[in-house]
Every structure is written in C-alpha cells, then in structure tokens.
Amino acid sequence: MIKTIVMSLLIFAGMVAYDSATSKPTPTTPPTKQEQQQQQINKHEKSAAMALFVSLLPDRKTWPSPMQKFYLAFNMEEVIDPIRQNPQWTPLKSMSQDIPKALIAIEDHDYYNHGAIAVDGVLRALLVNITAGEVVQGGSTLTQQFVKNVFLTHEQSMERKIEEAILSLMLEDNYTKDEILELYLNTTYFGAGANGIKQAANKYFGKAPSALSLAEAAVIAALPYAPSALNPLENPQDCKKRQLLVLAAMHKYGMINQAQLAEAKAERIRLSNGTRI
C-alpha cells in the first residue's frame, strides 16, 4: 500500500515537472500561415503513425483500461472533433465575453498563466475556502475539470487522479487555452438538463449566449460547482448567493470595475419561468 502511494506521488510529481518544463505562455501574436501548415503536417504524421500501429493490435475494446487511456492521450481528436460538430456548438467569440471571464474568475482565475496542473492552485483554494468558511474555490484547473467531465469518471481514486493529470497535460500540448475554454463551456452540465452554454442560456434566460448581461453570465458561471443544487429555477436563493461570489471574484481579479460590480449586483434578473433573483 505504502509503495503504491509513493509511486503514485512520484508519477504525479513527474507530471507536474513535465508540465512546468513544457507549458508554453499564451502567444501574443497568432501563428503565421507557415507555422499553421507545419502544425497540421505534424498532426497528420502523428495520426498516421498511430493508426498504423493500432491496426496491428487487437480490437481496442479488448484492451485493458490503462492502455485505452494511453491511446486516448495521443488521439484526443477522436472524442473532441465530434463534439465540435454538435449543432449546439457556440464559438467563444460568439458568446458574451462576460461568460468566460466569470467562469475563470470563480473556477480558475490564473487559467491563462499556469499549465494544465496548478499545484499552487490546490493550496490557494484550500486557504481561500478556510478563510471564507465555505467552499468558494476548487483546486482543479479548468483543463482538469474538462478532462474529468469528458474523458473520465468522477471516481475519487489515486489512479483516476493520475489519469486526469496525464490527459490534462496532453490536452494542453495539443489545444490552446482558448480552445480548451471553448470546449469546457460547450460540454459542461449546467443543471436542469442543460448541457453546454447554448442550452443553459436558453433554459434559464430564454436568450442566446451572446445576449447575456454581466449579472446573467455570473449566474451561468456559478452553476458548474453544483449544477443541480444551484439551479436558479429551483433554488434561486442559493444560486443568487453563489452569483454574488462570482461577481466579487471578477472584481477582485480586475475583470470588472466597481461601477460594473454595483450595477450587476443591483440587477433584478428575470429567469425564464418569470422568477426574479
């Protein structure tokens, strides 16, 4: 048992070290056309090599779970590409920019500055929650949350956490921060049967994601933490409390100013069922 724990910690430490060594800051300029073409060539070469290798193996459904996860780490597009073809898909640039800002503020405020795994984020979240006297902030990055929701189960085990770490690192090696954020918002369950931002905006406000106000975006960002318990149609008071935490976080991290904070807090939001919060 002790040996297993020690090995698990060593593997996790290795993943964090790998992340620190390979994570790249968000580029200040978009890649050139030549760089984009080279990226596509590299991607196709990798896919072709993997396809040839896999063709020599038994049916993938018969592989042990660890082997399936290893394959998935290098072929994430098999899962992600179909998701992007969903008619409900909403590009990041086509939604109110208050939505991603609100989500980042409450779930992972340093999202654009750290890698797939933020060890300091776990410790910081613990301190914030102790200070607040309640769970205000989670320790997982948005990348880890997306991986857990789409590729893995919610099982609480050391094996699952290691798989989550590995897949998160591989995801950030192959997709940009904006792409991962867009994937997160289009796949997350927001409660009341709403999967993805388009369904959530329509379900709770009868609006498109592009039409949400700052106050409404803060409601949406409040939901991933506990989508059923915070469903504003069923639990408006609890949702309002969490929404105020989101707005406070946005102000704290410089995403909105004092006037915007005051206006959003004062807004009487009308939900799709006529309730105002």
Q: Which residues make up each language-model segment?
A:
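Juxtamembrane regions of bacterial inner-membrane/periplasmic proteins
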Residues: 1-277
